[in-house]
Every structure is written in structure tokens, then in C-alpha cells.
């Protein structure tokens, strides 16, 4: 039994790392040097399945400990909305969000979770954590 299908999936996500999205803006952390956590949730995230073209729905959770900069939420909302019509696998999306947030604010700690609605009887949760060395 063949378990992978490179002819079906290879190359479908090559554009994701360089995908042009709105800038995630930031502001100065006036409590730099104090460790505190900022958590926020995107309860109505939508993108498109690159395989089927059907919409994917889920919740995106972000938790971070800032250093010098904090995420400006209106710009993050615009960033998240830019994925609405993008065909992206769950795993690629969580990693792309993680890398874009690291580039924007260089946090001490960051966790991104993509908790997707069940499709075809399968629920997907993708988690990535980052700790600054």
C-alpha cells in the first residue's frame, strides 16, 4: 500500500514561506524586562483547503512573552484576514504565522496553535512553540 502521494501534494505550498501578507505592526513594550504573557484568540479563522478548494474553519491561539515590542492587534487582524482565500495546509499556516510574528516582534517566548474544525471526521490541532535562546 502506497502511503504518500507526492504527485498530489508536492509543490502545492512552495509559495507559502514567501506569501505577501499585510505587515504585522508593533509598539514599544513599556514594561520591557518584566516577564508577562499576552494571549489572544482568533475565534473565526478561515482559509481554503489547497487540495479540495473548500473552506477551512478554526481557531488560532497566540501566546507570547514580549521583549522590546508588542503586537498591534488591528494589523494582526488584517494579517489574519489576508488568509481568507489562500489555499494553505494547516501545518504550513501555523509555521508561517509563527515565523512572521518572530520577525515582527522578536519575542522571548511564542506559542501558536491552529485548532481546526473537524472535516471528514478528523479534527486537526497544530502547535508550534518558540523560546528565544
From Swiss-Prot:
Keyword Cytoplasm: yes
Any GO CC annotation of this UniProt entry: cytoplasm
Compartments (UniProt record): Cytoplasm
InterPro entries: GTP-CH-I_C/QueF, NADPH_dep_7-cyano-7-deazaG_red, QueF, QueF_type1
Catalytic activity: 7-aminomethyl-7-carbaguanine + 2 NADP(+) = 7-cyano-7-deazaguanine + 2 NADPH + 3 H(+)
Pathway: tRNA modification; tRNA-queuosine biosynthesis
Keyword list, A-Z: Cytoplasm, NADP, Oxidoreductase, Queuosine biosynthesis
Intrachain S-S bonds: none
Protein name, entry field: NADPH-dependent 7-cyano-7-deazaguanine reductase
Free-text function comment from the UniProt entry: Catalyzes the NADPH-dependent reduction of 7-cyano-7-deazaguanine (preQ0) to 7-aminomethyl-7-deazaguanine (preQ1).
Family statement: Belongs to the GTP cyclohydrolase I family. QueF type 1 subfamily.
Protein's organism: Leptospira borgpetersenii serovar Hardjo-bovis (strain JB197)
GO biological process, one term: tRNA modification
One Pfam entry name: QueF
EC number(s) from the headed UniProt entry: 1.7.1.13
Binding site for substrate: 71-73, 90-91
HAMAP family: QueF_type1
